[in-house]
Amino acid sequence: MKKIALLADGWRRYVIYSWVEGIMEGSKELGLDVCLYFYNTNGTWSQDSKFNKGEYALNDLPDLNSFDGVVFDCTNTTNLDEIQYMVRKLQSVNVPVVSIGYKVDGFYYVGNDNKRLFRKVMDHMYYAHGCKSFVFAGGPPYHYENRMRFEAFKEALSDYGIPLTADMYMFGDFDYQTGVRYMSDWHESKKPLPDVFLCANDNIAAGLCATAEVLGYKVPQDFKVTGFDNLDKAAYFNPQITTVDNNRGNIGRNALEIFKALWNGTGDASDKYLDSEFIPAESCGCPNTGRVDYRNYIKNIIKGSVAREQEEDAVMILQKELEECNEYYDLFERYSDYIQSMKCDGVYVVGVSDLAAARNNAQFRKHGYDIDDEVVLYADDKDNGKLEFKSVNDLMQYMQSVDKNTCYMYCSLHFRDEIVGYVILRNPEFLYDHPEQFDIQSALLKRLENLFKQKVLENTNNELKNLYNHDALTGLYNRVACNEMVIPMFAELEAQNVGCTIVFLDVDDFKDINDTYGHQYGDELLKTCLLYTSPSPRDNRQSRMP
């Protein structure tokens, strides 16, 4: 059984499960026994940088040298420091690393051949449609795929004999609002319209086309637009957007092919620059592709809307039920029941000791993990039901004992940037159709933090009560405890005809000792007497009555 680690950052609050499916399905097709450990982070969703740090802390959990290969996906990561940190970390390991869509020295690359594919788009616009003025409507300037598409843009202009000027390219994000901003800013600037806006992806293209319509322009009559990635919004938009397929389904399998060649010493272990289909459509002046069934699409939208409403209702019910849980075990059990009601084979929860004990002086880590400071708080799977493990090492050994291809997905448990543990989902296939697992995880995190604070308060109150009821010198119950606990208990027992007795022991000449030798000698005398009397009463029921 080969162990593969997949480190991937989600798109906003969504999990990118297509890489997992590609690896798991590819392992069957290639005849490989694979156990995939998927470390999923969602560090691009929150506006709270400390929360995002808590997400990315998960990347420090795995011992990467213990794997047979690592797959790295930072295509959604917007934090450059995090990307650079992970690249340095991965460059130091002694196992092969395959990087998805991001070329790094020393790593194998799997992804679209962005330069060649973007050049296909430009050549089509130049030769088939006679475009002479071009604008690159780009994504983030640091993003590798965006950079490659921009390189293709510049090389094509040079080959066409068109000089590059600063007003011929724009950089932003990969989202719809970036396209909205590009079109709005261009309109307000009063600059002449280009023949074509070449967008770095379909989100930008859709935002640009929609805003153009609001501003009174017609695409492709007034100018043409192209996209990239072949998202649904390209195929079903009006006008249908010219695009390039993304190869999502093939990337995971191609990564596995590289590993297989390395493991077996045969086959092609070189970078995989994937070819994809160029799909001309209405936004560039070509006819509709005719590939889409609009009625079925509308039907699926309606069904999807109903399903989303049901899911949102279910999550709201789950949130309510989680809020009613007053013990960690009950909380994780309810969470597990919900997750396993979908396509998921098991849930395991690991927490740090300070979380488990709800210590009021808890010092949670912000970097790194210590397996000796972790406990298994909950474990349940469809093979063996409820499970108990004495240590996290025992859980890890259990997970590695699988005899079939398995995926374990890890999610961070954290209070902002403070690490409190992690959740492991076994074969969470539901994520392919329901990638919004982050909403469920957020509900769990919220209740877990509140429950921790509640337990800390309870423990603190118990500690204060213990101090209040006990003598500071001897640790015995004091007069307050006698008045508030013992006497009421006697009254209850006497009402039940149970006889009770209090025995008082007096220390002879105690006052003289205090007066003659000082109170410190009197204190020592009391503690000495306690040594002789402690073993006598059953259940150690003694008290000091000064």
Summary of predicted features, one role per range:
Residues 1-317:
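Bacterial carbohydrate/catabolite-sensing allosteric modules
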Residues 347-396:
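Structured interaction and signal-relay segments at domain junctions
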Residues 462-485, 505-521, 527:
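Conserved nucleotide-binding and Mg2+-coordinating catalytic segments in signaling enzymes
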